[in-house]
Amino acid sequence: MKKTISQVVSERILILDGAMGTMIQQYNLKEEDFRGERFAHIPGQLKGNNDLLCLTRPDVIQDIHRKYLEAGADIIETNTFSSTTVSMADYHVEEYVREMNLAAVKLARDLADEYTAKNPDKPRFVAGSVGPTNKTCSMSPDVNNPAYRALSYDELAASYQQQMEAMLEGGVDAILIETIFDTLNAKAAIFAAEQAMKATGVEVPVMLSVTVSDIGGRTLSGQTLDAFLASVQHANIFSVGLNCSFGARQLKPFLEQLAARAPYYISAYPNAGLPNSLGKYDQTPADMAHEVREYIEEGLINIIGGCCGTTDAYIAEYPALVKGAKPHLSLIHI
């Protein structure tokens, strides 16, 4: 019987995959790739709606998953970062959200199971990727009306629940609520996860990953990491971590803070350094690995991956780094 992610994370540092968007860019896809024949009737541009590729170019998404698994990833994320009715409304494809999530999970699940069967001693897991959406519950998009909100907590929670029910039915091993910039959005997602698990009768670990927006270590909605932890302590959280924001070196002080205070497993998936003036990431896989090595040697993490600018070449540096390394021990696990 395959071990669960909860069992394996206590034994060794797990490797999460890298960026999906960065990998998709390498395929130089055109509008017709995103649209396909099926969505010919949809108005507006669909190029850039990466999640839709699970339906129109599943071969590309599966190829990316395979590259990350070949690189040594223990956990691959579904291509569902924006697969909610809230986010898909901009593309006029919100009615396909359930199907998109089911398709995305199947693409990842089939490959994860294939690689687990090849080497049962290194089981592979699927994390359902849940992004923050393009709306915020706690801030106004209208500078002239601070009280205005683009959507309500209930609307967002319902949208998340629909996504998560499909993920759970599809067979994810965990739900990863990531790139959190608004704690109220995250709380809606946590509530939705709890409701989705009740509705489906399937329980999986809930992982959180926060994005700090400045060198002061606050989220976009203004919370410190300590305040964020206090805001979610009521929930049954498996892991908490940091992603995006900065490169590994710049992210380290915030990771140290999180590792010292959070009673959960700790994750980190930094960007490939900081973007240059053209928005590109210049840091090499070897350079990033050199910075990440400090996380591992200092016992800061349980799960390590990559965010913006990273590819399978970056993730391929990790297996040698984590081999034999001791995972982080939080206060609750000591």
Task: Identify the residue ranges that each predicted region occupies.
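Domain-level signal for soluble alpha/beta catalytic cores
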Residues: 1-332
